[in-house]
Amino acid sequence: MRIFKSHRLLKLVNSYIIDSPQPTNLSYLWNFGSLLALCLGIQIVTGVTLAMHYSPSITDALYSIEHIMRDVNNGWLIRYLHANTASAFFFLVYLHMGRGIYYGSYQGSRSLTWNIGVVIFIVMIVTAFLGYVLPFGQMSLWGATVITNLLSAIPWINQDLVEFIWGGFSVNNATLNRFFSLHYLLPFILAALVLMHLIALHDTVGSSNPLGISGNYDRLPFAPYFLFKDLVTIFLFMLGLSIFVLFMPNALGDCENYVMANPMQTPAAIVPEWYLLPFYAILRSIPDKTLGVVAMLGAILILMALPYLDKSNIRGMQFKPLSKIAFYIFIANFLVLMILGAKHVEDPFIIFGQISTTLYFSYFIIITPLFSIFDNILFDIATKKK
């Protein structure tokens, strides 16, 4: 083990993975980081392998996917692993962010770590959208057309910007080549951002803990205690992922994407992947195109404002009954938005979408600041009595 503490590169591995001191009371909710790192590794390895056989052409893209599935050794396994790990990646990210909001992991000196995490989330969304277009089935073509057309809401440069991204007057070969290049590049940028996320976490105050207090008084090294704990959830995760990949690989996909792209025929409903549905529902809930785009972007970017909106002296919601209720309502509302994102734009879904969008923004803009002020008042009263 001496080389781990003397070698220039291995010393970093030692400080982050082996000797890194962690609070002793960390629960399994702090295991998402290792699972997300595993997902990113799987995505990069399977993605690079798929890229060796993929053809970014509007005429050959779908055929190259079928070639991978039928002719490449274990190509079906690599493709389904890539597709289902993407869903698992977002599922774990949502759990990771939800845990961060519940336990106040964005407060104080951890705000930089939180904001880098939000940037990672944005890059993930862009990467997922680009990957969704690559098979170039019906949903790929029309999804690319609809989402890129949102840029026409930008004043002055609207349609010119859209055509610049397309490389023509509609989605074509140039578009697919650009999307493929960016989809290949962004995971490596994502890996760099993950390293920045880790550096920001470990070079400040380290991991938070379920009690929301300083963990400096009682810590244990990461290995072997938390390393073994991470391995438990990694094995369980691989078991769950294997069930999806081997027994129901298309459960989270869209059958329309197995149909050759046809610019003359619009699908009955144009919907993104399930993990982007809440933001798609926010976009569609506002009739005005420009305001809808602003609301959709605001729904993501408002997460960056959370460290400045929550000024409570008590970190987390463990001992705040009202905040707990508000948080669970927020989670339920987020799931409702996910359901509404897959529905047709018609009554009563339009009204429900507008109500859910209002509740989503109200949680951050109204409820969180008010509850933090209320908590601080109660905290001051309690301390003065003592």
UniProtKB/Swiss-Prot annotation:
Looking at the UniProt entry, the stretches that span the membrane are 32-52, 76-98, 113-133, 179-199, 226-246, 290-310, 322-342, 349-369
Known function: Component of the ubiquinol-cytochrome c reductase complex (complex III or cytochrome b-c1 complex) that is part of the mitochondrial respiratory chain. The b-c1 complex mediates electron transfer from ubiquinol to cytochrome c. Contributes to the generation of a proton gradient across the mitochondrial membrane that is then used for ATP synthesis.
Give GO BP annotations, semicolon-separated: mitochondrial electron transport, ubiquinol to cytochrome c
* Annotated compartments: Mitochondrion inner membrane
The GO molecular function terms of this record are: metal ion binding; ubiquinol-cytochrome-c reductase activity
This entry's comment on the bound cofactor is:
Binds 2 heme b groups non-covalently.
PROSITE patterns for the chain: CYTB_CTER, CYTB_NTER
**What gene is this protein translated from?**
COB
What the entry lists under InterPro entries is as follows: Cyt_b/b6_C, Cyt_b/b6_C_sf, Cyt_b/b6_N, Cytb/b6-like_sf, Cytochrome_b, Cytochrome_b_C_euk/bac, Cytochrome_b_N_euk/bac, Di-haem_cyt_TM
User: What is stated as this protein's family in its record?
Assistant: Belongs to the cytochrome b family.
* Subunit structure and binding partners: Fungal cytochrome b-c1 complex contains 10 subunits; 3 respiratory subunits, 2 core proteins and 5 low-molecular weight proteins. Cytochrome b-c1 complex is a homodimer.
Origin species, per record, is Trichophyton rubrum
Query: Which sites bind heme b b566?
Result: 96, 197
By what name is this protein known?
Cytochrome b
